[in-house]
């Protein structure tokens, strides 16, 4: 049973949220955004909130505790910058690479957000990181997590890798401090989407899968490597209802030969679209009025997320972001292009105007910047 007051306002269409506790509504948005990212819905029972809080993994993602910093409990106020990193771990002994790097910027009003991605192949200077015996150097951005995660004689530590990645992203963007961060296991996407009963999203163009057959099984590797053999799963342009494996597979695609002409930039756009689609799905009546489904989503989300709110819990942040909805999240595309040295591809670089975007984020001038640069708004978002 849902807890709360019954009844509706005259002349107003009843909300599916009527009678749902405020904490339950607001945990939806932040939980979903965190799950890229994302997805969790909390409705009806205090026990669900407790389960969610207890299920979410926690780690020292920014090195605060290791540095002796105290975590002060105070009100969460904007502006906020939240770093969201998706990983796709295959083996526990393999250092993780950051497959998706997103920043959610929330202005001081705390009622909307700007979501933008940094190319994982962005060529950057990665600072030295003595904890992992890394001396620093120039490499692709996603490698920062791998370098930082290394622990002598042990399996890699993703939380430590996140710390170096965060330092590198701060260096790239000029953002002095992240207010929260999360590591999302991409495999968890599948479980979350399936727990929600699938996700509805718009496919902007026909895309074929590099890795999956139409039935979801893996395609056969070519002898000697260099690609795959056999029929490919296809995602046709238009409205689609995707299962967990389909959603995860779709947002992984990045090759022009398979229908993604802008490569990793296209994949970033699809990931952002997927985040918003999951937010919408989480607010659907089918999810918010079904405690059994909610409980499944909770458990799937908690198992897929490591969170650090620098003294605040994920529920604290969800409450603080109570006014954000899917239609108030603006997805941003950062212009860039390839870096080649002696004809060989070495990664990506951002255009100079991206520095102006980062400055607008830092100085709370993002609205004025977007008015002057409407082309930064992601298409089909």
Predicted regions and their residues:
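Non-catalytic, solvent-exposed segments at the cell envelope interface
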Residues: 1-381
């Amino acid at each position: 049973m849902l807890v709360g007051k019954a009844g509706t306002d005259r002349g107003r269409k009843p909300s599916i949220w009527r009678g749902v506790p405020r904490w339950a509504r607001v945990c939806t948005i932040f939980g979903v955004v965190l799950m890229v990212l994302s997805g969790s819905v909390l409705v009806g029972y205090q026990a669900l909130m407790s389960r969610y809080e207890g299920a979410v993994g926690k780690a020292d993602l920014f090195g605060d505790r290791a540095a002796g910093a105290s975590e002060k409990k105070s009100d969460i106020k904007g502006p906020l910058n939240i770093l969201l990193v998706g990983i796709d771990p295959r083996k526990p002994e393999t250092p993780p690479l950051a497959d998706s790097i997103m920043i959610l910027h929330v202005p001081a009003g705390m009622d909307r957000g700007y979501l933008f991605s940094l190319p994982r192949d962005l060529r950057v200077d990665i600072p030295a990181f003595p904890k992992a015996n890394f001396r620093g150097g120039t490499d692709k951005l996603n490698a920062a997590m791998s370098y930082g995660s290394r622990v002598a004689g042990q399996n890699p530590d993703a939380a430590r890798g996140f710390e170096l990645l965060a330092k590198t992203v701060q260096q790239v963007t000029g953002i002095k401090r992240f207010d929260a961060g999360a590591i999302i296991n991409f495999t968890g996407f599948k479980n979350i989407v399936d727990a929600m009963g699938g996700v509805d999203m718009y496919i902007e163009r026909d895309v074929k899968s590099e890795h999956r057959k139409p039935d979801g099984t893996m395609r056969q590797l070519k002898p000697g490597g260099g690609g795959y053999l056999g029929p490919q799963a296809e995602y046709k342009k238009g409205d689609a209802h995707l299962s967990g494996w389909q959603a995860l597979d779709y947002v992984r695609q990045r090759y022009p030969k398979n229908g993604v002409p802008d490569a990793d930039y296209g994949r970033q756009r699809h990931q952002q679209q997927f985040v918003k689609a999951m937010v919408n799905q989480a607010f659907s009546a089918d999810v918010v009025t079904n405690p059994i489904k909610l409980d499944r989503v909770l458990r799937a989300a908690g198992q897929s997320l490591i969170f650090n709110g620098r003294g605040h819990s994920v529920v604290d942040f969800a409450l603080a972001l109570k006014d954000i909805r899917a239609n108030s999240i603006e997805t941003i595309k950062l212009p860039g292009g390839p870096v080649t040295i002696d004809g060989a591809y070495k990664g990506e670089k951002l255009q100079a105007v991206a520095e102006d975007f980062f400055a607008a984020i830092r100085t709370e001038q993002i609205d004025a910047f977007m008015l002057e640069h409407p082309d930064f708004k992601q298409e089909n978002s």
